[in-house]
Amino acid sequence: MKLRHLEIFYTVMTCGSLSRAAESLNISQPAASKSLKNAELKLGFKLFQRVRGKLLPSREALELFEKAQGIYQDLSNLRLLADNLARDPRAKFTLGCLPCLGLSLVPEIATDFYQQNSNLVMTLTAEHTETLVKKLDLREIDLALTMQPVQQGDIMATLIAEVPLVYVDKDYRQGAVEIDSIDQQRWISPGLDSLSTAIAAHRVFPATGLNVETCYMAMEFVKRGVGCCITDIFSARHSLTPEMIHQISPPMKIDLYLLRRADASLSPVTQKFVDFLCKRLRNELREINLELYPGNKKSIVSPV
């Protein structure tokens, strides 16, 4: 099947009639009919049967259409990639992050960077890691912040910070909590894979009566005194009052990774943001660590 035959076949399938397909392709109906007949001659079987003035796809056509849909999706992705390659990279960049970071850490840092760079065009998006990786592949975004060490294709993951985890509980008032002493009957599963994995390295909590898909939803229940949870310090500070946030003994952390394409250099403004981000994280996390765990002077941010 040649490309022009694929085009007329796919358009007839999606439009439902030869006349609408011809209109969509900006050709005459006789030309569309001739192209469809040529496709059937080339293939050696009928693609459509005319029944009461309507074109009904054959069994073979339905099977071909499944494959054709994938081809057209790839073409759509190719066009999107070409559009993204054509954009002016000099004073703009796009950052993706996890939803939990998009409600706490990222807006704070991005606001300060944006205000210091008046000629900047900055686009932010919040998605789960799998979607962020796809967007990096298509060059829809330049950078991504996630809590998973993705190693996939041309994607490079760099550890940029170790973020403290904290225990959140409206009713707890006894200082640092040992993870083994947390009441599993009150436990709210946070749902986030990377966070759950970090917690499971210290303790595996059995399934409970309350499970949520995001740490922010878990903290809404914590606010109401329904249960307790463990989350990152940035999300906790965004959602809860200080008396609901408690240290964990021994200290726990979750890794923060910067994702980018390994086969493409960063534009000057994107590199400037990366430097700004790492410096800001270094300073903030040093203060947070000393506040949570006095005497722990370890540097917890590594250079990119």
UniProtKB/Swiss-Prot annotation:
Location(s), subcellular? Cytoplasm
Q: Does the keyword Transcription apply?
A: yes
Q: How is its activity regulated?
A: AdmX-mediated transcription is inhibited by indole-3-acetic and indole-3-pyruvic acids. AdmX recognizes and binds the auxin indole-3-acetic acid (IAA), which causes conformational changes in AdmX that result in the inhibition of the expression of the andrimid gene cluster and the suppression of antibiotic production. It also recognizes indole-3-pyruvic acid (IPA), an intermediate of the main IAA biosynthetic pathway in plants and plant beneficial bacteria, which also prevents andrimid synthesis, but to a much lesser extent.
**Annotated GO biological process:** positive regulation of gene expression
Q: Which residues carry the record's DNA-binding region feature?
A: 18-37
Source species, domain of life: Bacteria
Q: Record's Pfam families? A: HTH_1, LysR_substrate
Question: InterPro entries attached here?
Answer: LysR_subst-bd, Tscrpt_reg_HTH_LysR, WH-like_DNA-bd_sf, WH_DNA-bd_sf
Induction context: Expressed in late logarithmic phase of growth.
Q: Where is the HTH lysR-type domain?
A: 1-58
**Cellular component aspect of the GO annotation:** cytoplasm
Following inactivation of the gene, the phenotype reported is: Deletion mutant does not inhibit growth of B.subtilis and shows decreased adm transcript levels.
Q: Does the keyword Transport apply?
A: no
> Which UniProt keywords are listed?
Activator, Cytoplasm, DNA-binding, Transcription, Transcription regulation
GO MF entry, a single one: DNA-binding transcription factor activity
UniProt record similarity statement: Belongs to the LysR transcriptional regulatory family.
Protein purpose: Positively regulates the biosynthesis of andrimid, a broad-spectrum antibiotic, by activating the expression of the adm biosynthetic gene cluster. It specifically binds to a region within the adm promoter.
In Swiss-Prot or TrEMBL terms, this protein is called HTH-type transcriptional regulator AdmX
Encoding gene, per UniProt annotation? admX
